[in-house]
Regions:
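Extended, charge-rich alpha-helical interface modules
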Residues: 1-104
Length: 104
């Protein structure tokens, strides 16, 4: 399903500012993804299992850090999924420019 969103701006400079803001946000998402993947690798190395295995088969009692370790690992995995989804949406966005001003 496709959704169309229209943003009216006063001038072309405003459009450039919006596009730049989106690019900056995508860069921040990429950095967040990298940081989160590093954290997940740390958990995987510490416990000797993949995040997928952890999410499918493990409980808090299975980890040396118990509940807190479990919650942090699961939270990082959930965060990664959300960041990747958001970045994917923005990367698939299409932008079109039209002039709706009556004097042009």
């Amino acid at each position: 399903m496709s959704v169309q969103m229209v943003i009216e701006l006063a001038d072309r400079q405003g459009a450039q500012a919006v596009l730049q803001a989106l690019e900056t946000y995508k860069t921040r998402l990429r950095l967040g993804i990298e940081r989160t993947r590093r954290r997940l690798r740390e958990f995987e190395q510490r416990h000797g299992v993949t995040t997928a295995h952890f999410l499918e088969r493990m409980a808090a009692e299975d980890l040396s850090g118990d509940d807190l370790e479990y919650v942090e690992w699961a939270g990082e995995a959930k965060l990664l999924k959300g960041l990747e989804t958001e970045l994917r949406e923005l990367e698939h966005a299409r932008f079109a420019s039209t002039n709706t001003s009556p004097d042009h």
